[in-house]
């Protein structure tokens, strides 16, 4: 089984500042997950460092999203949608193989 961990920063890629509240960003993330027909996810507020393509470094609020029981294609589509919804240069997608089940 694969576990997908997505990390999305909350600073706008153009202004390099957080333009929407963390709560509003979480609402947008939940909407993306709902439209992707994800049946469950764990969201955690974290802090992250990101170096933009122009070399600017930012320390930003981020959301870590842990997903099970979906396909890699679905995970990649979620990342693409989050890049648009949150106006990001990039979104992290980590894929881990593990043994997990709902009990």
Give each language-model segment a name.
Residues 1-103:
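Positively charged, small/polar-rich N-terminal and surface patches that mediate targeting and assembly
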């Amino acid at each position: 089984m694969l576990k997908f961990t997505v990390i999305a920063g909350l600073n706008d890629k153009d202004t390099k500042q957080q333009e929407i509240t963390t709560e509003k960003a979480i609402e947008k993330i939940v909407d993306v997950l709902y439209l992707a027909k994800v049946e469950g996810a764990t969201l955690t507020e974290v802090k992250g460092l990101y170096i933009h393509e122009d070399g600017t470094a930012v320390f930003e609020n981020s959301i870590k999203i842990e997903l099970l029981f979906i396909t890699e294609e679905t995970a990649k589509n979620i990342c693409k949608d989050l890049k648009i919804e949150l106006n990001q240069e990039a979104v992290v997608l980590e894929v881990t193989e593990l043994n997990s089940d709902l009990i």
